[in-house]
């Protein structure tokens, strides 16, 4: 891949999980970002342990050569929380802008079961009505406009357990929003939802012109099989090892890197692979991911 076009980041979720704070509670902010830098990454997304004052956070990252590239934002347009979502988005956007980021990754969380004790591979996930889809589209178009006014871009993170998870749901969303709304492509969630590498790559191919942020996440099919068989929740699956870093699971990332490179993708690729840090040492797995990307993507 072209080193001038692509930057590599890693998410803190491998060290400490915001949805399950007991996982990695012993890992401090300074340890996390120091290990990111030591593993060879130059970017990070934002976790719950990160200071939210740019004047405090930025110097602590600068000394380690780390930039903030994104931070998760939950939207609630489908269930009618438009004004509250937009107000909170503006504050979130201003924080990211102050940190030098230009991408804002959002997930539509209305009815989401990703944090609930419900089977993630059952039929409990939300399915939006036409009215709800229109609310979501109108809301995201508003966020896209607000971000553009700041010289930034909004992207939708398709995610297990949400109303925008499957290929069909991604297609529906992308058909309704305007050109100022982009897609955050996540290899692990695409594979998990659609059950294989071919449909995962099909999403990537179809939306290459609209993808402005990439999450690199590998999967362990035997764990996914157990999740399906035992009716486990998303978070129970995470604790058992549904996800891992690139090079440690079943996904061959070389076609992913080639598609992005051939298209001329410019932006961040973020290793975002949540698992139990007591079972998968975060620093060791960060080093493993960095080595794999160096060997397969040439960066």
Swiss-Prot record:
Catalytic activity: scyllo-inosose = 3D-3,5/4-trihydroxycyclohexane-1,2-dione + H2O
Cofactor(s) in the UniProt record: glutathione; Co(2+); Mn(2+)
Biological process terms in GO annotation: inositol catabolic process
Enzyme class: lyase
Keyword RNA-binding: no
Entry annotated with the keyword Cell cycle: no
E.C. designation(s): 4.2.1.44
Matches recorded under Pfam families: AP_endonuc_2
UniProt GO molecular function: manganese ion binding; myo-inosose-2 dehydratase activity
InterPro entries attached to this UniProt entry: IolE, IolE/MocC, IolE/XylAMocC-like, Xyl_isomerase-like_sf, Xyl_isomerase-like_TIM-brl
Key words, A-Z: Cobalt, Lyase, Manganese
Family: Belongs to the IolE/MocC family.
Protein name per Swiss-Prot or TrEMBL: Inosose dehydratase
Provenance organism: Klebsiella pneumoniae (strain 342)
Gene behind this protein: iolE
């Amino acid at each position: 891949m072209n080193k001038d076009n692509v930057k590599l980041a890693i998410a803190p979720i491998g060290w400490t999980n915001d949805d399950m704070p007991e996982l990695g509670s012993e890992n401090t902010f300074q340890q996390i970002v120091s290990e990111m830098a030591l593993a060879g990454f130059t970017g990070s997304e934002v976790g719950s342990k990160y200071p939210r004052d740019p004047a405090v956070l930025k110097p602590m990252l600068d000394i380690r050569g780390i930039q903030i590239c994104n931070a998760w934002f939950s939207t609630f347009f489908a269930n009618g929380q438009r004004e509250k979502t937009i107000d909170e988005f503006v504050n979130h956007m201003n924080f990211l802008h102050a940190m030098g980021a230009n991408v804002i990754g959002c997930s539509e969380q209305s009815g989401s079961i990703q944090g609930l004790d419900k089977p993630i591979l059952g039929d409990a996930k939300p399915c939006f009505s036409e009215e709800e889809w229109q609310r979501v589209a109108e809301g995201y178009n508003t966020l896209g406009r607000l971000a553009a006014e700041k010289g930034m871009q909004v992207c939708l993170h398709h995610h297990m357990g949400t109303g925008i998870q499957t290929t069909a749901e991604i297609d529906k969303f992308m058909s309704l929003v305007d050109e100022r709304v982009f897609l955050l492509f996540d290899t692990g969630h695409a594979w998990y939802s659609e059950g294989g590498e071919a449909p995962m790559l099909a999403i990537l191919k179809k939306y290459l012109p609209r993808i402005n942020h990439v999450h690199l996440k590998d999967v362990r099919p035997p764990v996914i099989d157990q999740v399906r068989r035992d009716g486990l929740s998303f978070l129970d699956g995470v604790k058992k090892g549904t996800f891992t870093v690139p090079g440690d699971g079943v996904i061959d990332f070389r076609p992913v890197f080639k598609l992005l490179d051939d298209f001329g993708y410019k932006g961040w690729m973020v290793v975002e692979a949540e698992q139990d840090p007591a079972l998968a040492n975060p620093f060791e797995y960060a080093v493993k991911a960095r080595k794999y990307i160096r060997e397969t993507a040439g960066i």
